Amino acid sequence: MRIYDGSPRQNYEEVLRSVGAFLDQRGMREVMVVEAPDGFVVQGIVVENSTSGAWSEHLGQQTKDTFTFLDDDIARFMEEGHARRDNEQRAVTWGQAGYYEQAFRVVGRYVDEQKPADIFFFEQDGAFVLRLLMRPQTGRRHVIAEFTREEVEAMIAQARDFRGERTKTQPGA
């Protein structure tokens, strides 16, 4: 993975978090992420609403979208995420962040701990399957890791405490 300005050597946690925030905004689900030499390829299902008929019937059509995020796109997503979280009026607390922003962040944390050469993963119904290309002294090899939806949700619940963050008190709460 490319080193982004101001980031540690490998920072899948922050990179994947920013990609996840984009996917949340897009309403994407059942996603696949492949790391490429110059960024990431992301594919998933989106439900697009369309209006048709005399009675304006709302029909949702599922489409499969594919995005190629180059290094510059990733850097921009990260900057936008930092700006959003640093802006007190627009700040999104951890509990308000979308599912993919949270899930990709904790999966990214796991990936950072493994220190792979590159990654591939897919998500379906909240469960993740990862294939990491490792660089042990005996030669490169792929390692598979799986996380159930419940495991990912537990990782999300623990993430705030792990980083020393606490849920911000909401006004009127």
Describe each region flagged by the PLM.
Residues S18-T51, F104-P136:
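Amphipathic, interaction-prone secondary-structure segments
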